[in-house]
Amino acid sequence: MLRPALLCLACLAPRPATACETALLLAMDVSNSVDVAEYRIQAEGLALALADPVISEILVQDQIAIAVMQWAGEQRQQLSIGWTSMTSAASVAGLAARAMAMERAFVLSDTAPGPALHAAIDAFGSAPDCRRKVIDVSGDGTPNSGGSPAAARQRAERAGITVNALAIEAPGHGLAVSNFFRRALITRDGFVITARGHRAYTETLRRKILREISRVTG
C-alpha cells in the first residue's frame, strides 16, 4: 500500500534551497491503551501521511524538519526518529520508510502527556533553525500519571512552540480526550482534531499534518 505512494515522491521536481519553514515533532501515544494492532495503524498511518503527494511536495518545498517521539508513562519518552530535514524526495521517502519500520518503544505503561510534552520541548534543543516550531501530540486517553500538563504548555508558549493534538476517540462515545487536549494541552494558537477510532487515524493524521505545514497567508 505504501509502495505506490513512495514511488510518487520521485515525481517531485528539485527546488532551490530555502530556509526551514517548520520544525515539526510528532509525539505518538504508545501507552497501555494502545494495543499491537493500533500501534501498527499509527506507524503505518504516519508513513502513508508523509508519502502523500501533496504533503511530500510541501515538505520539500519548505525544507521542513521532522522528528518522531513515542511517549507513554511519566519516565517513558523516546525520540525514535531524530530531526530529519526534508530536502529532497529521497529524504521524504526515507523518513516514510523509517516510520513504517519503527518498533514500539514501550509496552504496559501509563498515560502521562505532561512529561511527554516536556520531553518534546527538550527535543527542540537539537532541532534545525526553523521559522516555526510545532509539536503534534496524538493520544487515545486522558492522564493517569504525571500530573497536569499545564506547566509544560506554559513552557511551550514561552518558547514560541505551538502545540496541536490529535485525539483518538472510541466510536459512539463522547469527546473526553478531545476536550482534555483542548482544555489542558494545546497552546493558545493550537488546535485539536478528532479521529473516531484508530481506523480513522491515517486520514485524520494526513489532514492534521497538511494543516500544520501549510503556510498561512493573508
Where are these regions (language model features)?
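Second-shell loop/turn segments in exported
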Residues: A27-A37, G82, M100-D110, S138-P143, ...
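VWA/integrin I-like adhesion module and closely mimicked acidic/polar interface patches used
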Residues: T142-R183
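Exposed acidic/Ser/Thr-rich ligand/metal-binding surfaces
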Residues: L108-A159, L210, S214, G218
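N-terminal signal peptide c-region/cleavage motif recognized by signal peptidases
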Residues: P14-P16
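Von Willebrand factor A/integrin I-like adhesion domains
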Residues: P171-T217
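Bacterial N-terminal signal peptides that target proteins for export
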Residues: M1-A5
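Von Willebrand factor
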Residues: C20-G82, S85-M86, A93-S138, N164-V177, ...
